[in-house]
Curated annotation (Swiss-Prot):
InterPro entries: Flu_M2 (IPR002089). Residues 44-97 are intravirion. Keywords: Disulfide bond, Host cell membrane, Host membrane, Host-virus interaction, Hydrogen ion transport, Inhibition of host autophagy by virus, Ion channel, Ion transport, Lipoprotein, Membrane, Palmitate, Phosphoprotein, Signal-anchor, Transmembrane, Transmembrane helix, Transport, Viral ion channel, Virion. One of its GO terms (cellular component) is host cell plasma membrane. Residues 1-22 are virion surface. A lipid is attached at residue 50 (S-palmitoyl cysteine). The record marks 37 as: Essential for channel activity, possibly by being protonated during channel activation, and by forming the channel gate and the selective filter. This is Matrix protein 2.
Length: 97
């Protein structure tokens, strides 16, 4: 006898499990853990950028600029922007014939 015929049998309404002893606490706990794991995995995949950025940097927005002259603030902003700008000189264009 195959495993399929031992566990599941076709009925008029669809597939039904013969071993419907779902009152076992271990089965209930495993089902709850499985459902929670699936929900957390889906949320992780949907929001992974937000979640890991928050964990990495926390709620910090950057160093405090309180008491710093405006000219120094602008210089700092410019340095930060230059650090993230892409330098096209580092890329090599390869043309296939």
């Amino acid at each position: 006898m195959s495993l399929l015929t031992e566990v599941e049998t076709p009925t008029r309404n669809g597939w039904e499990c013969k071993c419907s002893d779902s009152s076992d606490p271990l089965v209930i706990a495993a089902s709850i853990i499985g459902i929670l794991h699936l929900i957390l995995w889906i949320l992780d995949r949907l929001f992974f950028k937000c979640i890991y950025r928050r964990l990495k940097y926390g709620l910090k927005r950057g160093p405090s600029t309180e008491g710093v002259p405006e000219s120094m603030r602008e210089e700092y902003r410019q340095e930060q922007q230059n650090a993230v700008d892409v330098d096209d000189g580092h890329f090599v264009n390869i043309e296939l014939e």
